[in-house]
Regions:
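Bacterial lipoprotein signal-peptidase II cleavage site
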Residues: 27-32
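Substrate-binding/active-site clefts of carbohydrate-active enzymes
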Residues: 42-48, 58-98, 103-287, 291-292, ...
Length: 573
């Protein structure tokens, strides 16, 4: 751990005027034919600590659903399931997390190009469960027991696309082909084309004959039940009109391509501007909430859907669930982009409650903490600058029917995830830097999210290397990183200021060298909610080379607590 004044990183609070979250009631497990009564299990989402897991990689609790498993081949199913999650809820409690974000549950196109859909993002039928993960009874049992322990469940969903459910019959021979276009003559480009995944075409993917273009390529739905490569379901999702049919995106900076194009890999872009498609998506996912008593959605690829979709989808979902007794239902979106203004746009106009805070992941956790280990570190003034943009870029008022907290105060903070290399990969295994980053994650404003395996010092690189098998760790709860997280989650739980308080930056610096304050970042968390407001002072030294100080040599750091009135305790010491 980096040192401040030669002592451990300081997370100090005044004898913690604490307000911990009350225990919530038990939930019985309904039979397959019964739906659970919907209930609101969350008082304030800022009290939660999210743990993102890939079901297939977390724990294998039922070998009976281990068909097509190839142990150790990370592009293939490994056997994790919902029973495995249920069997290890005690592990998650010991870590101190309070909400589980589970990977998509619906039936997928099983395999493509020798890669399996273990992740869940190649959906084929929104009305059926993925049999690799278990059945309805095992999923309900896991969720009911999680709720019984005070754990909440966020479901990963996709509104942008379906899996590889059809092909473009470019050569009009009625079967999917991979072939080379071009005569091979001088100056004639040679292009390999897959009818499963052709490139973007502004007017739609075209068919060709020997005479040249012959109009829009017919869309032909597949019928291969052995790997679920069949027409999308339900209803309208099995019709040509439900898809844009433009081929895959070539330029992700082109808004038209980004919102109308297929996702690379043959993932078919839905015509989400159509009222019938919108209604189908709202209904299909809401039915799973009703069947399972889920507590929120993490929504994939939100920047690839037209912006007008999100207020409609979110508010229709809120109204439907509230009528059945489910409020404070969290919906946060994933837009893989460092543009803070773009991220914030998804919270405007009463749309999403929150987003995955990618701009912070890139600028802060990569730029400041990770790069401290490998060179090119940014100053901590970059953290303050980004935080100051929140009130400009994110909605600052409570969304009607939403979670009761403005999006600007409920951003989902994370260090890494399943789409980027793990922190320890990029930092060359620097666990001190990781622990420092985790300290910020669990004390800053917003909702912290921890990617599974972080607690076990996983260090995988790019996909699928960053989607390791957790049970190979034997669920060790004694490691330094596991214990560091557990201590921080306990501190957070005990301090209402760290969960709900206002934030004031007290020291940031552009210095990253040998200056006296190089790498220092300090902030206060104050208040929370009456009747027991709290106080916490967080001081971090991101400099890997020296014990820095909260001074520039002449001016010391000032805090809001009057001198002589308060005793601060180093709760990480």
């Amino acid at each position: 751990m980096r040192n401040v004044f030669g002592a451990p990183v300081l997370v100090a609070s005044l004898v913690c005027a604490s307000a911990t979250c009350p225990e919530l009631g038990c939930v019985s497990v309904p039979s397959d034919g019964m739906q659970p009564a919907l209930a609101t299990h969350v008082l304030d989402w800022r009290d939660e600590v999210i743990y993102q897991l890939i079901t297939d990689r977390f724990a294998d609790g039922d070998v009976n659903n281990d068909f097509t498993v190839e142990p150790g081949s990370l592009g293939k199913y490994q056997g994790g399931d919902w029973k495995g999650i249920e069997d290890h809820l005690d592990y998650l409690q010991a870590l101190g997390v309070t909400t589980l974000w589970i990977s998509p549950i619906v039936q997928n196109v099983d395999s493509d190009a020798n890669i399996d859909a273990y992740h869940g993002y190649w959906q084929q039928d929104l009305t059926k469960l993925n049999p690799h993960m278990g059945d309805l009874a095992s999923l309900r049992s896991m969720i009911a027991h999680a709720h019984d322990l005070g754990l909440k469940i966020v479901l990963d969903i996709v509104c942008n696309h379906m899996g590889q459910v059809f092909f473009y019959d470019i050569n009009k021979n009625g079967q999917p082909d991979d072939y080379v276009n071009g005569s091979g003559g001088p100056g004639d480009p040679v292009v390999q084309v897959s009818e499963y995944d052709p490139p973007w075409a502004p007017g739609g993917v075209l068919s060709f004959s020997q005479e040249g273009s012959s109009g829009r390529a017919p869309i032909i739905f597949l019928n291969n039940p052995t790997i679920n490569r069949m027409a999308g379901q339900p209803g309208i999702l099995s019709t040509v009109g439900a898809y844009h049919g433009m081929g895959h995106i070539l330029d992700f900076n082109d808004v038209t391509q980004r919102t109308l194009g297929d996702f690379t890999g043959g993932l078919k872009d839905l015509a989400t501007e159509l009222p019938e498609v919108r209604a189908t998506l709202v209904d299909s996912f809401a039915k799973w909430v009703e069947k399972l008593d889920l507590d929120g959605y993490r929504i994939d690829t939100v920047k690839h859907v037209e912006s007008s979709f999100w207020p409609v989808f979110a508010n229709a979902t809120r109204q439907r669930l509230a009528a059945e007794g489910k409020t404070n239902f969290l919906m946060f979106g994933e837009a893989f982009d460092g543009n803070d203004q773009l991220l914030g746009s998804f919270t405007q106009n009463d749309a999403l409650d929150s987003v995955f805070y990618f701009s912070q992941a890139f600028q802060v956790y990569d730029g400041v903490f990770e790069n401290a280990s490998v060179g090119g570190q940014s100053g901590t003034d970059q953290i303050e600058g980004l935080w100051n943009q929140r009130i400009m870029n994110y909605a600052t008022t409570v969304i009607p029917g939403g979670i009761g907290v403005p999006p600007s105060k409920a951003l989902v903070n994370f260090i890494d995830n399943h789409d980027v290399p793990r922190f320890l990969f990029a930092s060359n295994g620097d666990t001190d830097a990781l622990h420092n980053a985790l300290t910020l994650l669990l004390t800053e404003d917003g909702i912290p999210d921890i990617y599974y395996g972080t607690e076990q010092d996983f260090s995988g690189g790019n996909d699928p290397g960053n989607r390791e098998i957790l049970w190979l760790s034997n669920f060790n709860a004694q490691g330094d990183t596991f214990q560091h997280i557990a201590k921080l989650t306990g501190i957070r739980k005990a301090s209402i200021a760290l969960r709900r308080g206002d934030t004031t930056v007290r020291w940031s610096t552009p210095h990253v060298g040998t200056e006296i304050d190089a790498g220092i970042f300090a902030f206060e968390r104050t208040g929370g909610d009456a009747p027991a407001p709290g106080y916490a002072l967080v001081v971090l030294n991101t400099n890997p080379h020296q014990a820095s100080s909260t001074t520039d040599g002449t001016n010391p750091m000032k805090v809001s607590v009057p001198p002589g009135t308060t005793t601060l305790t180093d709760v990480l010491d």
